[in-house]
Amino acid sequence: MKYALLISAGLLLAASQQQPAQAQSAHELINQAVAAEGGADALRGLKSLAIKAEAMHWEPGQSKAAGGEPRFLGNTSLLVTWDLANGMARTEWDRDMKYPSMERLKFTETVTPSFGYVTDEKGSKAASSIRVAASLRELERASPTLLLKALDAKSGVRPLATEKRDGKNLLAVGFLDGATNFTLLLDPQTKLPVVIRTRDDDNIVGDSNYDLVLSDWKAVGDAKIAHTLSYQLNGVEVGKVTYKEVTANPTIAADAFAMPDAVKAEAKPPATGNVPYQWVIRRIFLGRFLDSDGIIAPPGTGLKLVELAPNVQHVQGGTANNLIVAMKDHLVVFDAPYGELQSRWVFDEAKKKYPGKPIKYLVLTHHHMDHTGGTRTFMAEGATVIVPAPDKAYFEKVARMPHTIVPDELAKKKRAVKVQEVKDQMSFKDDSDEIRLYNITNPHADGMILGHIVKENVVWVTDILSPRGPIERNAGTLAVGEAFKKYGITGSTIAGGHGATAKQADIGPALGMEVTSR
């Protein structure tokens, strides 16, 4: 129930504020926090760090059940070379991934105030500007010298309300660091920072607290540095980093952060404005970040309609797809990937392709955030949202979540929202076509809709079978095959929530069935 509690926490945030305590000024509190970390001289003496660390990551938006326990993603070894004085870092990631697939991922991310690049077994490439911005912000959040910046700031430091956490009334200071508003929560006894917070937009939860929770303070030189760093979204842990070795002021090679000549022409400065921080950070955690400022499509490309039949359009070109089906007098859309960016594109293109036909239904195959982040856009346009049982209450709550940090269409034009559940089967039928929806047993999520457009014999499947390259037999593809057997589907074209299409007749072994022509 952790993600459900996360959503509920978001609803209560606005109601939980207190008036700031004025007993001490913000600068007095910062002075005390700096002293607790060893003092200004000790912190100024930290010019660089070498860190060996172990990390674990989780994703609440990929839980097995909607609102359930966050999915464990895997273990990571980290080697960090960090030039604190110049705001540069090189981080080597060695990842033993457990989800979304069992694999080993190795790469090095190098970031400076002006650019970033990523190196893996294929070579180096420039990082997107949104990745550079997110990485720089997170380095700043975790930096042991963040308090020094607040201490030296001439403005932008202000007292905030105390906040109760684990039985303590934590002292609070706001610090405007460039374009980032940090909330610093301090232990009332030790004066050490407990939480470094930003307010972020999440594509499902909306207005959110993104917290770095610090503990296990140890001496590094004359300073103190937290050795356990827990990253939490509205109190739900999404990352935990444990420092195993920390060396103060190591020798750093002169070219440690230099960008390779081959990628200099593509170097991008950090993005400004509305950076989708949570999407960038957590897609990197998931091992599925598309390093593109297009967010949903690779550089230089975009979404496109691929016609599977005159009344069936496959939205391809992004990290995840939609399907548009034209009925006699309305449209049905399957899935709502990423967020408003993709949903708005789908709305606009659907209207051009099928003028005069409103989108009446949005069918969500399952609850995972990468396929449902754009749901609220369809809600704002009046579409009825169809979800697999038992997800109705979850999506009704999603509709109520505040989105004021990055206001979306539903926040701007509030309206009643209708969510309907498919327990076993449901169908839409008119004079032109029929769509059958089946809530199928599968290993990926509790509640998964398979959609069958009957006349054209197109089947929509998301995640448990993805037509991109050879399709190997696994628990997901076998679940699709079992559904085909149960409902008598043969000779179909399978359209994927990822990838493109596949012919059922061509992938019989993966489906665990002998396929005959229809």
Task: List the model feature ranges, each with a label.
Residues 306-350, 448-466:
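Conserved beta-strand hairpin/beta-sheet module of binuclear metal-dependent hydrolase folds
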